[in-house]
Amino acid sequence: MGISYSVDVDPDETAKAMLRERHMSHKHSKEIAREIKGKTAGEAVDYLEAVIDGDRSVPFKSHNTGVGHRNDIEGWDAGRYPEKASEAFLDLLENGINNADHQGFEGEEMVIEHVAAHKVGESPGQKPRAFGRASPWNTPQVDVELVLRTEDDE
């Protein structure tokens, strides 16, 4: 049984990639996925590298209570610089571009048609507290799926 994606796509026009059980924030992953969808793979790589460097911020549209305002976001105010999730998305995009190149496509020029982050569980952990107690300190696990499609010249 292979890995299933949440969308059905034509393998003659698309390339796919997936991250499995990556330790990163699900909320950050959702916001990054929303922001890079519709961009070309090359544009998304440039954007994520700028996020990691602190030059561009990711708009936080749903999980934004207490999030500071950024002046580099068009049409929105709240944003952050999620470095760990951005690095994971860079790995995913590199994998997707390499898969596309292997299939005979021009990977950098393909458009991100579908990207989705799914919370799949937690890695249990504990944090020691006073008087011999311990509190749960779990780490979230996220699956991210990516579908790249060739640009239509219509």
Curated annotation (Swiss-Prot):
TM ranges: none
According to its UniProt entry, one GO biological process term is: cytoplasmic translation
Q: Which UniProt keywords apply?
A: Ribonucleoprotein, Ribosomal protein, RNA-binding, rRNA-binding
Instruction: List, alphabetically, the Gene3D superfamilies matched.
Output: Ribosomal protein L22/L17
**Which CDD domains does the entry link to?**
Ribosomal_L22
Q: Where is the signal peptide?
A: none
Q: Which InterPro entries match?
A: Ribosomal_uL22, Ribosomal_uL22_euk/arc, Ribosomal_uL22_sf
Q: Name one GO cellular component term.
A: cytosolic large ribosomal subunit
Q: Which GO terms describe its molecular function?
A: rRNA binding; structural constituent of ribosome
* Any matching Pfam family: Ribosomal_L22
Which top-rank group of organisms is this from?
A: Archaea
> What does the record note on quaternary structure?
Part of the 50S ribosomal subunit.
Q: Which NCBIfam families does this chain map to?
A: PRK04223.1, uL22_arch_euk
- Family (UniProt): Belongs to the universal ribosomal protein uL22 family.
Question: Which function does this protein serve?
Answer: This protein binds specifically to 23S rRNA. It makes multiple contacts with different domains of the 23S rRNA in the assembled 50S subunit and ribosome.
Q: What is this protein called?
A: Large ribosomal subunit protein uL22
Organism field: Natronomonas pharaonis (strain ATCC 35678 / DSM 2160 / CIP 103997 / JCM 8858 / NBRC 14720 / NCIMB 2260 / Gabara) (Halobacterium pharaonis)
Q: What is the lineage of its organism?
A: Archaea, Methanobacteriati, Methanobacteriota, Stenosarchaea group, Halobacteria
Question: What gene is it encoded by?
Answer: rpl22
